[in-house]
Amino acid sequence: MKREMKAPTTPLESLQGDLKGKQGRTSGPARRSTKGQWTPEEDEVLCKAVERFQGKNWKKIAECFKDRTDVQCLHRWQKVLNPELVKGPWSKEEDNTIIDLVEKYGPKKWSTISQHLPGRIGKQCRERWHNHLNPGINKNAWTQEEELTLIRAHQIYGNKWAELMKFLPGRSDNSIKNHWNSSVKKKLDSYYASGLLDQCQSSPLIALQNKSIASSSSWMHSNGDEGSSRPGVDAEESECSQASTVFSQSTNDLQDEVQRGNEEYYMPEFHSGTEQQISNAASHAEPYYPSFKDVKIVVPEISCETECSKKFQNLNCSHELRTTTATEDQLPGVSNDAKQDRGLELLTHNMDNGGKNQALQQDFQSSVRLSDQPFLSNSDTDPEAQTLITDEECCRVLFPDNMKDSSTSSGEQGRNMVDPQNGKGSLCSQAAETHAHETGKVPALPWHPSSSEGLAGHNCVPLLDSDLKDSLLPRNDSNAPIQGCRLFGATELECKTDTNDGFIDTYGHVTSHGNDDNGGFPEQQGLSYIPKDSLKLVPLNSFSSPSRVNKIYFPIDDKPAEKDKGALCYEPPRFPSADIPFFSCDLVPSNSDLRQEYSPFGIRQLMISSMNCTTPLRLWDSPCHDRSPDVMLNDTAKSFSGAPSILKKRHRDLLSPVLDRRKDKKLKRAATSSLANDFSRLDVMLDEGDDCMTSRPSESPEDKNICASPSIARDNRNCASARLYQEMIPIDEEPKETLESGGVTSMQNENGCNDGGASAKNVSPSLSLHIIWYQL
């Protein structure tokens, strides 16, 4: 019967042991053994194993046991069996050593700290610090409020002392556990009877992170050392008990569980260290105020057709300015003082000269970005910042006389830039004032009005073109500088008054034409020829360099042709012997006679005839035009870029003395054909001369012999012509080239070439002119 009674009890005991182990340890790695107390035999085996392995390899030590782990063996040795273990009260010297080492290593390196305290382990040092030596510990007597909070928190979390620490700042888990077991548990009935708990139920239970227990402000810098520690290396990782493990997790990984309610928060009294830590934690919970650069003002964009149809009749209606940020549509928590400091007050109200608030009276096509500060380009601002302006504003800067913009430089511009007489204002942003408020320096603006109420840093957005008809009328102001505007610190665009048309050269200067009698303002013509579709936003940086000024094009196809207004003269002259045109720099009207006054390359007098001729003259060509048709055709084909390619020769380089010799040879080859024709005409003239000689009354015997033999005379003429041609051919020219040219050969006649000298005197004057020119 005894055996039968013992048989069923064995599984129950093992089941109870398993349940006990599972209930006692809810986290961490699974244990291989759930065996309870150590027997004296196991303690003796453990001591021998530690002596054998010198207390280093605990895995080898655990192999000496059947159901023990390395952690169990380590804890048994360190806490119980180690003969060097010091148990009992802490001395004053030990407490001072722990305080110094915590300030040096931080409240995490307990194994390192325990090495400086012989006989003490890391667990003992940690518990001594958190329960007694930590300056953030509240050692005062428990108050009634703290006890009521402990009761309410214990109703929710039970015996989880680490969780209860969050509601009781300054109290450690050990002190909370001791006070609960010793005092509060006995007072529960009295608290329920008095009704104090019912009164506290209405207020929310606030969990405050008990940072003062886990760390102190003097060694918060050493928290990063925890990442270097690994499980199993430090002694405290293996020597912590169940309660200390939960405590370490609760003190290291604390979270804020704040439940917001309508009542006031529970803020108990703290010590100096605790107040400093909580104030640091509360500083991160302040509301976020977006910076001024994140704010953007968006102005509704209205097409030009709508503006022209309305004709600004509804000028008194106010328009909304939608203030947006990167993520929200409003600025949360921004006070009126902040708005006044940031300059937002000017964006919502436009102040006139009398100081009265008026609503915005104008719809704009542009958008203002407050993040882009419209300061000088050489200032210490963002180089990528851009200010958006319209094409019409660009025209006012590039062609100030054509735009008749005198109001922008008048002394009354102040806050209302365009036409202050009609009360039409423009949206101004006090960017310079904001910059001066932040940096303490007033930036120098490139726009300097003469009046006392200058711009003062206002960045004015231009109005639409339809409003410019009323606002851009010239006004006679004695104090108004006509040419005193610059383009936001870009390259200076000097406005000059000249007799030429408005023209932009590559150096960034603006040349404008107009009558000096009218004060620099020409007749009223405006920019009516510019289509309204071209009024688009362009970045201001496109006018910041002189090289970009030439890239601005305005459609001028629809501009009506006007007589006696003049135009840009573009007749590109050409270099000699090359088909390379260059741009004419004529800045005067084509019908004027002032082209002689301007010569960019110094060859105006030389090249002036080429502009009026269909074929440009060469520098070495003869003034006579009796050349062969082939030569004239080739020269004409080379001068026209649209001629067929079959008539063109290969393009030569620019003028070169070496290449000109090839050109001279070709000219001489072509001239020999015309010379042969002249020789044929010479034969006719000589024949006529022979007839005249035969008709003379007195004839010498020698002349009779010459006339008697016409064949001999013909040979003499050939010899004379050959001699003349030899004189015309250069010495360095080969006879082979002369043969190929088809001209007369240089072979002498056997029948007396010396007798042809008299025949050479009868050469015609035209032939003599050719001979003299070719010899040169």
UniProtKB/Swiss-Prot annotation:
Subcellular localization(s) per the UniProt record: Nucleus
Mutant phenotype after disruption: The double mutant myb3r1 myb3r4 often fails to complete cytokinesis, resulting in multinucleate cells with gapped walls and cell wall stubs in diverse tissues (e.g. in embryo during the first or second division after fertilization, in stomata guard mother cell) and several pleiotropic developmental defects, and associated with the selective reduction of several G2/M phase-specific genes transcript levels (e.g. CYCB2, CDC20.1 and KNOLLE). Hypersensitivity to caffeine, an inhibitor of cytokinesis.
UniProt DNA-binding region: 58-81, 110-133, 161-184
Region feature (Disordered): 1-41, 217-253, 364-384, 401-435
GO molecular function: sequence-specific DNA binding
Consequence of substituting N223S: In strain: cv. Landsberg erecta
GO biological process, one term: positive regulation of DNA-templated transcription
Annotated effect of mutating M607V: In strain: cv. Landsberg erecta
Main location: nucleus
A cellular component term, taken from the record's GO annotations: nucleus
Domain of life per record: Eukaryota
Induction: Constant levels during cell cycle. Activated by CYCB1.
Annotated Pfam families: Myb_DNA-binding
Motif extent (Nuclear localization signal): 648-655
Record text on subunit structure and interactions: Component of a DREAM-like complex which modulates a variety of developmentally regulated genes and of the mitotic genes in proliferating and differentiated cells.
UniProt name for this protein: Transcription factor MYB3R-1
